[in-house]
């Protein structure tokens, strides 16, 4: 089930300061709030590693990276020390790579699950190839509701996806055919259309900004097929996700 969280000083844009996948979770090292880290820890401890980090000294790590169970791509602003910290902290099977892309806010420009990535139409060709190789995904250049920042206006798991609330039916059908999961047009944080800023999700759990309403939370739980997390369920889903990649 989805859990409400907030960053420092009642900031509900939790996705800007964290990144959640089926193999790991990254949390901003600059947060002064212990509750932000422990919120993730309460659902993920003992299941996947939770790593605190910054990228180029910035706490807005969710905006500056993109990843899935196969890999993690980081903005060119990341320092050598930060890069080595992540390589040392994440599972050996996760490929961690810095990418020399002019659009440094990778999390805003790319939305992905473990199989497909939707990307900003103006990404460099080399970047597209690196995304495909490192994340192990099919890559599609797209817009969502006429917005090029597809990573901001879409969140995906292997079970479903949520997109900008102004996405029309024809576009929803096209996007669903590309990503091969059910989609819903929705909001988080009491009407925010910047989906990924207020939502982090993987195949068995999700975290939403603290302003997310009960109705919005219900939509998240339904589209991403989240159930009441129990140890056996979480463990089996995590193992299945990792085995798919590493065997």
From Swiss-Prot:
<keyword id="KW-0396">Initiation factor</keyword>
<comment type="subunit">
    <text>Monomer. Associates with the 60S ribosomal subunit.</text>
</comment>
<dbReference type="GO" id="GO:0003743">
    <property type="term" value="F:translation initiation factor activity"/>
</dbReference>
<comment type="function">
    <text>Binds to the 60S ribosomal subunit and prevents its association with the 40S ribosomal subunit to form the 80S initiation complex in the cytoplasm. May also be involved in ribosome biogenesis.</text>
</comment>
<keyword id="KW-0539">Nucleus</keyword>
<dbReference type="Pfam" id="PF01912">
    <property type="entry name" value="eIF-6"/>
</dbReference>
<dbReference type="GO" id="GO:0005829">
    <property type="term" value="C:cytosol"/>
</dbReference>
<dbReference type="GO" id="GO:0042256">
    <property type="term" value="P:cytosolic ribosome assembly"/>
</dbReference>
<dbReference type="GO" id="GO:0005634">
    <property type="term" value="C:nucleus"/>
</dbReference>
<dbReference type="InterPro" id="IPR002769">
    <property type="entry name" value="eIF6"/>
</dbReference>
<keyword id="KW-0690">Ribosome biogenesis</keyword>
<protein>
    <recommendedName>
        <fullName>Eukaryotic translation initiation factor 6-1</fullName>
    </recommendedName>
</protein>
<keyword id="KW-0963">Cytoplasm</keyword>
<dbReference type="GO" id="GO:0042273">
    <property type="term" value="P:ribosomal large subunit biogenesis"/>
</dbReference>
<comment type="similarity">
    <text>Belongs to the eIF-6 family.</text>
</comment>
<dbReference type="GO" id="GO:0043023">
    <property type="term" value="F:ribosomal large subunit binding"/>
</dbReference>
<dbReference type="GO" id="GO:0005730">
    <property type="term" value="C:nucleolus"/>
</dbReference>
<keyword id="KW-0648">Protein biosynthesis</keyword>
